[in-house]
Amino acid sequence: MSDTEYLTRAEAVLAAVERTVDAANDGDHDIDLERNGSVLTLTFENGSKIIVNLQPPMKEVWIAAKAGGFHYRYVDGAWRDTRTGTEFFAALSEYATQQAGLPITFTA
């Protein structure tokens, strides 16, 4: 994948996360979302955080959550965990639901 393709796909991930948080905040959630360049910080009511950031040199998207740190690479049409193959949005949904204490589903 070229650098341009990576940036287009990775920025789409950040935009999808932002859209989901905005929609969740219209419902029962209270998630603070801060973007600083290519880093998104989601802060939940209990003070816990999830950080999603882009890693252009490695062409990856990373998640840092209470569950740990996870690296995702674009493979066969989806961002997949480099160790387990878990899809990015499914994993982020699980981590955010755990930390928020309420269900939240992230999609592309």
Curated annotation (Swiss-Prot):
A GO term, aspect molecular function: ferric iron binding
GO cellular component: cytosol
Record bears the keyword Iron: yes
Organism the protein comes from: Burkholderia multivorans (strain ATCC 17616 / 249)
Coiled-coil residues: none
Keyword Glycoprotein: no
Keywords from the UniProt entry: Iron, Metal-binding
Name of protein: Iron-sulfur cluster assembly protein CyaY
Gene3D superfamilies given in the database record: Frataxin/CyaY (3.30.920.10)
Record InterPro entries: CyaY (IPR047584), Frataxin/CyaY (IPR002908), Frataxin/CyaY_sf (IPR036524), Frataxin_CS (IPR020895)
